[in-house]
Amino acid sequence: MSDQRTIPAGKASFAARIARGSAITLAGFGLSNAIRLGSNLLLARLLFPDAFGIMALVSVLMVGLVMFSDIGITPSIQSSKRGDDPDFLNTAWTIQMIRSVILFALACALAWPMAWFYDQPDLLQLIPVSAISLLILAVQPTRIDTASRHMVLGRLTMIELASQFLSVALMLVLAWATGSVWAIVAGNVASAAIKVALAWLALPGITNRPRWESAAVSELVHYGKWIFLSTAASFLLTQSDKLILGRYLTMEGLGLYNIGFFLAGFPILMGHALIGRLMIPIYRENPPAHSPENFARLRRVRMALSGLMMALMVPVTLGGVWLVDLLYDARYASSGVVVVMLAVALLPQILTLSYDQAALASGDSRGYFWLNGTRAGLLVVLMLLAVPLVGVAGAALAIGLTHLLCWPLGARLAHRHGAWDPVHDALMGGL
């Protein structure tokens, strides 16, 4: 492909791009999670609950390595004035390759400590093979970030769905044939390979080549040093429950918790998907502090997102036990109570879910870090206090309290960038 293939700016209005991007993201998220739920249900019948527990630990390590080394390449490309400059993009791609190779080596080195700490010898083999996906993602093109920058999301969503569907099909065939947790590992590696191949073949944009431009490195590092710390904090926010519970629960118990978390967290995950794709471009092109019209536009988008998440969360909260009984066999019945507890605990997140994106769009990655760092530190402390006493219920309590207690900090950060909406918070908090 020629280097001259680029994504056109287009003449569609910004509102039309928001509407189209929202519709595509929602459709993609719905289909993706339908595939994920279907595969989860089928795998639950082909494998045993402890398989989901041990893969939760593998996933925690893979996610942790990626998040603890994230210097914010994607949000930097989305928000930078040089986000379409080939030298900037190629430098970002080169940094990504170096990082991925280092992550693979770290994953291999951490396999033995993980196996020893959780007393699971299988992790010695499962972790290094799973880490092959990190090497594959090293050559993922920046075309993905360019498509996201310009909210050209249709083809990007199709690539993600195709890679997920094909890898799940492979996973299910292998699980049926072997009854082994290795089926999940093979599917995850295949997913990375398919996504990278399709991105190179199907997305417009430059053909990335190794490049090291000092100015680009300086901008990426300056922006990314706080993103690095913020994503490390985000890892603790999203994965510390599994790390801590994995020490106190059996692998079967951890697997049941993981299934419950997936069902309870669906609306929040959908919100993150929409916000991650839409909010930085919205803040960048329509800064809410610049005019009442921009603020009103942002309020409409935020109200729609929060209302949608709330409408999905309430039925999950009320019907979690029934949902698990409907979808899973008797071995997984305990997940129903987990769904209810976690759905209640996750509700406070809706209040401030989009506020931190205002900081990123303004280049305030430091403020973004302090918010996430405070949340993470508080969550870990509450988890360590509550989980040994009451187990899974303690984890749910810690999650809920963390987001309630940190709401003033999120509101303060949003206010600094003209994005705080007390009307939104009062309405959603009242509900």
Predicted features and spans:
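Interhelical loop/hinge segments that connect adjacent transmembrane helices in multipass membrane
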Residues: S2-F14, I18, G154, M158, ...
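C-terminal transmembrane helix end/exit motif
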Residues: S2-R5, T74, T142-R149, L153, ...
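Interfacial segments at transmembrane-helix termini and the short loops linking adjacent helices
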Residues: G10, F52, W112-S130, T317-L347
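Transmembrane helical elements of multi-pass membrane transporters/channels
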Residues: G21-L37, S163, S167, I184-A199, ...
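Alpha-helical transmembrane segments of polytopic membrane transporters and translocases
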Residues: L42, D50-S69, S133, A193, ...
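Helix-loop junctions and terminal segments of transmembrane helices
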Residues: F68-D84, S148-R149, G260, A264-V301, ...
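Membrane-interface junctions at transmembrane-helix termini in multi-pass inner-membrane proteins
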Residues: S76-D85, I136-E160, W182, A343-T374, ...
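Hydrophobic alpha-helical transmembrane segments
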Residues: L124-A131, M158-G205, Y223, F261, ...
